[in-house]
């Protein structure tokens, strides 16, 4: 993207973060939710590759940097309240660190959370653990 929109006008939380939902651009499948700060959003818009902020590691998380499961960004949309982002991406491989295609594999059924999809790849293969 040649010129970035004004990212300061977005409504970040007290930690300076905004939720970002990644959706497969051609199927509409919701892949994951992660956090972005102004810098990671600027990088995403500039490079066309998803970059998030990892709250657990307290650092930038360039999707696919260790697993190879990159998200190429086709579009970034902002909701009407300016407090949530939607990234339309082309997911290469799996999106979830569990080896599943998306992170939403648990479904409320009969009073508990049931696993509805199996991993497509062993997480140890993804991260070399």
UniProtKB/Swiss-Prot annotation:
Molecular functions (GO terms): magnesium ion binding; phosphoribosyl-AMP cyclohydrolase activity; zinc ion binding
Keyword Cytoplasm tagged: yes
Binding site for Mg(2+): 79, 81, 83
Zinc in keyword set: yes
Enzyme class: hydrolase
Enzymatic reactions: 1-(5-phospho-beta-D-ribosyl)-5'-AMP + H2O = 1-(5-phospho-beta-D-ribosyl)-5-[(5-phospho-beta-D-ribosylamino)methylideneamino]imidazole-4-carboxamide
Cofactor: Mg(2+); Zn(2+)
Record EC number: 3.5.4.19
InterPro entries: PRA-CH (IPR026660), PRib_AMP_CycHydrolase_dom (IPR002496), PRib_AMP_CycHydrolase_sf (IPR038019)
Superkingdom of the organism of origin: Bacteria
Any one cellular-component term (Gene Ontology): cytoplasm
Gene Ontology BP annotations: L-histidine biosynthetic process
Protein name: Phosphoribosyl-AMP cyclohydrolase
Encoding gene (name): hisI
